[in-house]
Amino acid sequence: MKINQLAVAGTLESGDVMIRIAPLDTQDIDLQINSSVEKQFGEAIRATILEVLSRYDVRGVQLNVDDKGALDCILRARLETLLARASGIAALPWEDRQ
């Protein structure tokens, strides 16, 4: 999936997450996580984000994650919404998911 533009998904409310994405000129993934629960769940948050990016074959992006204690399902939903917005597609290819 090609990320074409800046996009934001989520809020800074307790129990939610705000994620910002921007395209990069390289194929790197620049992931910055700021979380109120980073000591306990930082690695799990990072793993979830990288799993979703891998599933949709996303590379060459900068991600800024401001987590306020979001559950894993919320993190995934926000990230998938963000990818759809940033790539300019109306919906993700659900039928291709495994």
From Swiss-Prot:
It comes from Salmonella arizonae (strain ATCC BAA-731 / CDC346-86 / RSK2980). Keywords: Cytoplasm, Phosphoprotein. It comes from the Bacteria. The keyword Cytoplasm applies. Its main location: cytoplasm. Pfam families: ACP. Coiled coil: none annotated. It is found in: Cytoplasm. Oligomer with a subunit composition of (alpha,beta,gamma)6. The modification O-(phosphoribosyl dephospho-coenzyme A)serine is found at S14. This is Citrate lyase acyl carrier protein. Covalent carrier of the coenzyme of citrate lyase. GO terms for cellular component: cytoplasm. Belongs to the CitD family.
